[in-house]
């Protein structure tokens, strides 16, 4: 590849923010965009009827509830770097969409509420990052409130997330006594000023912690800081970039996102530490971002980003080569060449037509139903990028249509919403009632709302006695025999794959035992 392409690749950073609900993820997203010049004014994020909602929460239901229920993609420039930020759903139900977003990024920012410490959703999401050895930077948020001791927070990560921590900044006090942070490597003391435009008061570079100026500025709190830093020098892990890039160590920063404090130091370090676009695995070989031929994959489909146009956008991660507007690419699953005329880049709901894009960039392609999650596009080579799964649903509902004349609109709505991958749709081999499955319960409320709001279809959901599903594969004759014998519990999913529904774990185990010639899969990689 030309050197010019290497420069383009190396200045890109593609990352997602993960956290437990209410840890301040959407607030920090807003503040990062503020520093990147992408927005002029950050909108505090909470459920309220205000004229201004958080930039990344654009769907109608999100605006009403003040939660992020879809993953937005935002692009901005900072210090010469092109940053692609993927905002993941903040409610603890939205795991599946989030899991897939994590397949499209090269690193992750983990936001932890310093009052509550590590919470369940953070744990779940970290497991997904660990599977992929994703590098993680940690931001301890809400230092302007009384929370847990900083050393206890580090201990919490090490014990609960089984990950080594390396503090980079250290807080001076907390809550009402919060004075700022001390950078353990640059020896800068950054003062917190709630009245300042971005929360940052003056920045003081000191000769060391024995500088008498500190006693003057911090009073008795300086003893606390000296004691903490002395402890850290003996007990804390020094930052090790290689361990961070291998997903084994997380550098830790402290601050208060709502006051924009500590966010700039975090962003500066992120640019320095986080990896540029990484090589990607396919079923046949590893693709380097520096290769000349173009390639990439779809990790998300979003219907009705613009309800006025009833459109569907496929979110696409570029893995190698250069994208140019109007280029022809091979859609490998369908085995045909397609022209990508109007690709877009995103700023939440705002879109701009893209003339060119590079590895690490996320572009949107208009989708008329032919693109599915996991689809690979190349300049001719038969590749398939791996690791974009569907998870077996844990919750199920039967869909009852309130107006029988709307059955076609219902089918269209269910299939389009299922294409986004947040819910799965199942049609029984016997009977006519659709069943939808989700990894989290809130998805049912989202589907009901969106069917009514976007497709003018009113439905009721009824409970069904299923607790899990498995995708079934095997020799054709055996599969046909299975379909006959288990017809009451066999469904076809939105991808046309055979699915077995089980009413209990015992029933599932028993069925697997009885049909040893067949394979029962807990995840279905998008084909």
From Swiss-Prot:
GTP binds at residues 19-26, 87-91, 141-144. One of its GO terms (cellular component) is cytosol. The gene is prfC. It is found in: Cytoplasm. Its main location: cytoplasm. NCBIfam families: prfC, PRK00741.1, small_GTP. This is Peptide chain release factor 3. GO terms for biological process: regulation of translational termination. CDD domains: RF3, RF3_II, RF3_III. GO terms for molecular function: GTP binding; GTPase activity; translation release factor activity, codon nonspecific; translation release factor activity, codon specific. Belongs to the TRAFAC class translation factor GTPase superfamily. Classic translation factor GTPase family. PrfC subfamily. Residues 10-278 form the tr-type G domain. It comes from Pelobacter propionicus (strain DSM 2379 / NBRC 103807 / OttBd1). Signal peptide: none annotated. It holds the Pfam family RF3_C. Keywords: Cytoplasm, GTP-binding, Nucleotide-binding, Protein biosynthesis. Increases the formation of ribosomal termination complexes and stimulates activities of RF-1 and RF-2. It binds guanine nucleotides and has strong preference for UGA stop codons. It may interact directly with the ribosome. The stimulation of RF-1 and RF-2 is significantly reduced by GTP and GDP, but not by GMP. Gene3D superfamilies: P-loop containing nucleotide triphosphate hydrolases (3.40.50.300), Peptide chain release factor 3, domain III (3.30.70.3280), Translation factors (2.40.30.10). InterPro entries: EF-G-like_DII, EFG_III/V, G_TR_CS, P-loop_NTPase, PrfC, RF3_C, RF3_dom_3_sf, RF3_GTP-bd. PROSITE patterns: G_TR_1, G_TR_2.
């Amino acid at each position: 590849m030309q050197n010019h392409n290497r420069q383009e690749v190396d200045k890109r950073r593609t990352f997602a923010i993960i956290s437990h609900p209410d840890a301040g993820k959407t607030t920090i997203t807003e503040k990062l965009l503020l520093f990147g010049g992408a927005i002029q004014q950050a909108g505090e994020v909470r459920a309220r009827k205000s004229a201004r909602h958080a930039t990344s929460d654009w769907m109608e239901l999100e605006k009403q509830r003040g939660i992020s229920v879809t993953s937005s993609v935002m692009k901005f420039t900072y210090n010469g770097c092109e940053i692609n930020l993927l905002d993941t759903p903040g409610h603890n139900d939205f795991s599946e969409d989030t899991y897939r977003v994590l397949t499209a990024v090269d690193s992750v920012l983990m936001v932890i509420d310093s009052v509550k410490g590590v919470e369940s959703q953070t744990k779940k999401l970290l497991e997904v990052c660990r599977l992929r050895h994703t590098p993680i930077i940690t931001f301890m948020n809400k230092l302007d409130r009384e929370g847990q001791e900083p050393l206890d927070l580090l201990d919490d990560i090490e014990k609960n997330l089984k990950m080594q921590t390396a503090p980079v900044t250290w807080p001076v006090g907390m809550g009402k006594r919060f004075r700022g942070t001390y950078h353990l490597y640059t020896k800068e003391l950054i003062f917190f000023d709630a009245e300042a435009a971005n929360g940052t008061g003056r920045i003081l570079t000191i000769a060391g912690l024995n500088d008498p100026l500190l006693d003057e500025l911090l009073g008795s709190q300086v003893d606390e800081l000296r004691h903490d830093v002395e402890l850290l020098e003996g007990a804390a892990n020094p930052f090790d970039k290689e361990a961070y890039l291998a997903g084994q160590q997380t550098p830790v920063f402290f601050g208060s996102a709502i006051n924009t404090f500590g966010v700039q130091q975090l962003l500066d370090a992120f640019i320095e530490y986080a990896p540029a676009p990484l090589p990607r695995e396919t079923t046949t070989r590893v693709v380097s971002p520096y290769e000349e031929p173009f390639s990439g994959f779809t990790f998300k489909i979003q219907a009705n980003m613009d309800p006025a146009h009833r459109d569907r956008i496929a979110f696409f991660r570029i893995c190698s080569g250069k994208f140019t507007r109007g280029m022809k690419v091979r859609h490998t699953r369908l085995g045909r060449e397609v022209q990508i005329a109007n690709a877009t880049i995103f700023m939440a709901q705002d879109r701009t037509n893209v003339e060119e894009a590079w590895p690490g960039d996320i572009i949107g392609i208009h989708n008329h139903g032919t693109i599915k999650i996991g689809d690979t596009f190349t300049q001719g080579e038969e590749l398939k990028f791996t690791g974009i799964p569907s998870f077996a649903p844990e919750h199920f509902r039967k869909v009852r249509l309130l107006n029988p004349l709307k059955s076609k609109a219902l089918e269209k709505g269910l299939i389009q919403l299922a294409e986004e991958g947040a819910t799965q749709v199942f049609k029984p081999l016997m009977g006519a009632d659709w069943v939808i499955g989700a990894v989290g319960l809130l998805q049912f409320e989202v589907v009901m709302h969106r069917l009514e709001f976007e497709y003018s279809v009113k439905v009721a959901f009824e409970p069904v006695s299923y607790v899990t599903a498995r995708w079934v594969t095997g020799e054709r004759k055996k599969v046909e025999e299975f379909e006959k014998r288990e017809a009451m519990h066999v469904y076809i999913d939105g991808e046309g794959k055979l699915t077995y529904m089980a009413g209990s774990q015992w029933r599932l185990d028993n069925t697997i035992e009885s049909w040893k010639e067949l394979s029962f899969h807990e995840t279905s990689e998008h084909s």
